């Protein structure tokens, strides 16, 4: 039998790369990579009887199902495969099988469906199937019809509602189409399902069992129950996948075991460790084949005629899926996978396969002219989504191979693959590198044995394979024609290569009397939060409606002027301990007092004034200080705080540049309130400020450092004229254009009440203040001398 060897992968005996190995380089392995016919393909054409080779016990990877034995004699004329009697017999067998699956197989797991035995339905199914699908088979064959009926039971009617799964919405027809595909491996679109439902409904309408499956019950649609969803045991990806090669050979898979009938306590599918959580547009690995052997000279390049067998994946040696985090030191052993998982620009959305290979090494060099053969084949299932391209439609297939030793990359190779005509892809596995490695290991073993260190050489080889790992990444691109159908714009990620699969390799040397075997399993990554269903309670909780009055009463009343935490800490360093002034909680009827008679907002008169003086109270300005945390730092100069011998202390607020676009009022220059369109703090500005808490965070600057970026603080002053006068408030005079007060800092535009309130309201606001000398320089004769110390403001 001719084999499909790649000539460019042949390694000659006198190759320069092998001359440096040693004296036995003339006996180095010649190698070939991949793309040889599987053992099962040649087993059927060659006689295997009488062989003592253990390879004769190979099991076929593509087993044919047993042919049912008919109860009546078959026609003997087999020359014509389309004999009418033979076709009639096949139809009767399929019909009998379908009726059996519809009847006794599900008698105890679902309700009866009387319409399947109705005359109209049987006549419809007896018609010859003329319409065919893209796969060349009838659109609704007996196999697909049975899967369709099962899908109706598994997916109750949902009306116009959608089922949310992995961040996407699915209608009932889409769920039915997906159910059919997972059960049979044959794809039928949502429109085909809808058309088939309409055809069946035309002559089954009125049947109670049919109505139950196609229409929502009135009591269920009006009642406030939980949303109806698929009655599957787990999510859509958790259906049992078909065995390797089942789709190609098995004419009728085992029917699915369904859930009990609908109940209101049905739970939503949730994530489990055995799930894959893959998108419907992604591909899954449904089968794998791997062999590595040495062919003797002048012998066919077949594994059944192998001179030595390093390892083989016999049958479908598939292990249960395992979480990736359970793989010990996977980030160190597979650096490429670790970097791929952390790449946010190219998220990992393909399956990860782990192959654990046990290698049985040779005791001596093979005969001169021997060849190394490696066969690796992946069976990649088509995506579940009807719009995603199939495997044979993908283009530009590539394979990247990375080989590591203790996490250090020792070899890297890239190969272009042949476009597959089916779902099977055959990537190479660097047979040249393996031939060189096996030859070098055999040479080291022979040299160690000649010096009497046999066990040392064996342990060294075992440690080498224990530290050896490999990663293979298979990619492909969507063809331009299908890319346009999917409405992808130029430059979109669809034009880039798509990961089809990632293969991880771990190696081990066999023990004495062991044979080389290979197993594989799928690795499960942690599900993305956007692709995972949120759990919901098993029973719904109906809360009584809340009236508007109850909502308003339950809302806590916010105090307009609320003292910030640690407001009196500013005075502890420069004044004796004083009792804080507890603010009066304004009642609801006090809201009107916040507004002046002219209708303007009154910021200063909103505080309820006590009748007695403030000789033993904290100054109001210190209570309303919006920058209390600036005083946490100690400084050698107490500039900016004017202290009198027996009166509260007044804090002068420095100029702070406020950001713009805050939809409220803030403190600006000269402690004036400014509107939202000018010098207000923005909650989301460029300074990584996410809230007011960040804006008023504890400062790490001292007061001296702040003076370099803001107006300088005045020199300390402890005497104020008239601070021992009467105990009543004095009114501040309103300065007009012809009467000004000397101020030490330069004035800034738009930092006053102009534009915020009319001039008449300004007179009322400022005139509302009393002339109490205890206001620390706020009376008519109290012009603070602190402002006279400096006449310039440092530029910011």
Curated annotation (Swiss-Prot):
It is found in: Nucleus. Disruption phenotype: Prevents the formation of normal conidiophores. Fails to form any viable conidia, even though it does produce morphologically normal phialides. Keywords: Activator, Conidiation, DNA-binding, Nucleus, Sporulation, Transcription, Transcription regulation. Residues 133-207 bind DNA. Residues 215-254, 612-643 are annotated as: Disordered. GO terms for biological process: conidiophore development; conidium formation; phialide development; positive regulation of conidium formation; positive regulation of phialide development; regulation of DNA-templated transcription; regulation of transcription by RNA polymerase II; sporulation resulting in formation of a cellular spore. Residues 341-362 are annotated as: Leucine-zipper-like. Gene3D superfamilies: TEA/ATTS domain. Residues 243-252, 629-643 have a biased composition (Polar residues). GO terms for molecular function: DNA-binding transcription factor activity; DNA-binding transcription factor activity, RNA polymerase II-specific; RNA polymerase II cis-regulatory region sequence-specific DNA binding. Belongs to the TEC1 family. BrlA, abaA and wetA are pivotal regulators of conidiophore development and conidium maturation. They act individually and together to regulate their own expression and that of numerous other sporulation-specific gene. Controls temporal and spatial specificity in Aspergillus development. Directs the differentiation of phialides and is continuously required for maintenance of their function. Expression of abaA leads to activation of brlA and wetA, cessation of vegetative growth, and accentuated cellular vacuolization. This is Conidiophore development regulator abaA. It comes from Emericella nidulans (strain FGSC A4 / ATCC 38163 / CBS 112.46 / NRRL 194 / M139) (Aspergillus nidulans).
């Amino acid at each position: 039998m001719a084999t499909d060897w790649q000539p460019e992968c042949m390694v000659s005996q006198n190759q320069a790369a092998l001359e440096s190995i040693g004296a036995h380089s003339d006996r180095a392995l010649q190698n070939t990579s991949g793309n040889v016919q599987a053992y099962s393909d040649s087993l059927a054409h060659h006689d295997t009887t009488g062989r003592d080779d253990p390879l004769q016990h190979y099991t076929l990877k593509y087993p044919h199902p047993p042919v049912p034995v008919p109860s009546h004699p078959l026609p003997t004329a087999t020359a014509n495969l389309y004999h009418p009697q033979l076709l009639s017999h096949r139809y009767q067998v399929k019909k009998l099988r379908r009726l059996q699956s519809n009847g006794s197989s599900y008698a105890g797991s679902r309700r009866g469906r009387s319409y399947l035995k109705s005359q109209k339905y049987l006549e419809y199914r007896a018609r010859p199937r003329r319409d065919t699908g893209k796969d060349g088979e009838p659109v609704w064959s007996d196999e697909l019809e049975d899967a369709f009926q099962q899908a109706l039971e598994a997916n109750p009617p949902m009306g116009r509602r959608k089922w949310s799964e992995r961040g996407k919405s699915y209608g009932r027809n889409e769920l039915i189409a997906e159910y059919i595909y997972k059960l049979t491996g044959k794809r039928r679109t949502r429109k085909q399902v809808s058309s088939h439902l309409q055809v069946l409904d035309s002559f089954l309408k009125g049947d109670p069992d049919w109505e139950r499956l196609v229409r929502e019950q009135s009591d269920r649609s009006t009642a406030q129950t939980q949303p109806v969803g698929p009655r599957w045991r787990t999510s859509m990806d958790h259906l049992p996948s078909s065995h390797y090669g089942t789709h190609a050979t098995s004419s009728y898979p085992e029917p699915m075991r369904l859930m009990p009938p609908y109940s209101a306590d049905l739970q939503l599918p949730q994530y489990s460790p055995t799930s894959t959580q893959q998108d419907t547009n992604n591909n899954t690995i449904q089968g794998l084949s791997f062999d590595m052997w040495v062919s003797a000279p002048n012998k066919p390049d077949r594994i059944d005629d192998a001179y030595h067998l390093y390892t083989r994946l016999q049958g479908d040696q598939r292990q249960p899926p395992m979480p990736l985090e359970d793989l010990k030191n996977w980030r160190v052993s597979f650096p490429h996978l670790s970097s791929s998982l952390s790449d946010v620009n190219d998220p990992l959305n393909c399956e990860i396969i782990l192959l654990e290979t046990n290698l049985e090494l040779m005791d001596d060099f093979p005969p001169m002219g021997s060849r190394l053969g490696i066969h690796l084949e992946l069976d990649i299932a088509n995506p579940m989504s009807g719009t995603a391209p199939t495997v044979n439609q993908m283009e530009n297939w590539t394979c990247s191979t990375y080989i590591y030793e203790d996490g250090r990359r020792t070899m890297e190779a890239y190969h272009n693959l042949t476009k597959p005509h089916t779902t099977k892809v055959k990537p190479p596995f660097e047979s040249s590198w393996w031939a060189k490695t096996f030859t070098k290991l055999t040479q080291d073993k022979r040299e160690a044995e000649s010096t009497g260190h046999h066990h040392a050489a064996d342990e060294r080889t075992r440690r080498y394979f224990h530290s050896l790992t490999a990663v293979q990444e298979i990619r492909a691109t969507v063809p331009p024609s299908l890319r346009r159908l999917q409405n992808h714009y130029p430059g979109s990620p669809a034009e880039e290569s798509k990961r089809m699969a990632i293969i991880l390799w771990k190696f081990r040397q066999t023990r004495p009397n062991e044979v080389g075997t290979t197993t594989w399993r799928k690795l499960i990554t942690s599900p993305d939060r956007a692709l995972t269903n949120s759990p919901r309670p098993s029973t719904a909780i109906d809360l009584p409606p809340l009236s508007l009055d109850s909502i308003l009463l339950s809302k806590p009343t916010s105090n307009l002027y609320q003292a910030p935490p640690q407001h009196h800490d500013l005075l502890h360093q420069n004044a004796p301990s004083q009792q804080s002034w507890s603010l009066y909680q304004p009642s609801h009827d006090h809201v009107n007092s916040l507004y002046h008679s002219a209708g303007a907002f009154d910021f200063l008169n909103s505080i309820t004034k006590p009748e007695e003086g403030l000789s033993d109270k904290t100054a109001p300005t210190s209570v309303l200080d919006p920058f209390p945390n600036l005083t946490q730092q100690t400084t050698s100069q107490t500039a900016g705080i004017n202290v009198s011998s027996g009166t509260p202390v007044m804090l002068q607020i420095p100029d702070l540049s406020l950001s713009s676009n805050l939809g409220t009022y803030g403190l600006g220059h000269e402690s004036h309130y400014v509107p939202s369109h000018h010098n207000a703090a923005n909650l989301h500005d460029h300074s990584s400020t996410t809230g007011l808490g960040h804006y008023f965070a504890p400062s790490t600057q001292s007061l001296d450092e702040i003076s370099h970026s803001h107006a300088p603080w005045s020199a300390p002053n402890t005497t104020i004229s008239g601070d021992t006068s009467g105990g009543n408030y004095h009114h501040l005079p309103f300065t007009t254009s012809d009467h000004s007060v000397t101020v030490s800092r330069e004035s800034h535009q738009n930092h006053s009440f102009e534009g915020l309130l009319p001039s008449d309201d300004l007179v009322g606001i400022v005139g509302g203040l009393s002339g109490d000398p205890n206001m620390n320089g706020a009376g008519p004769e109290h012009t603070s001398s602190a402002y006279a110390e400096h006449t310039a403001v440092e530029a910011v």
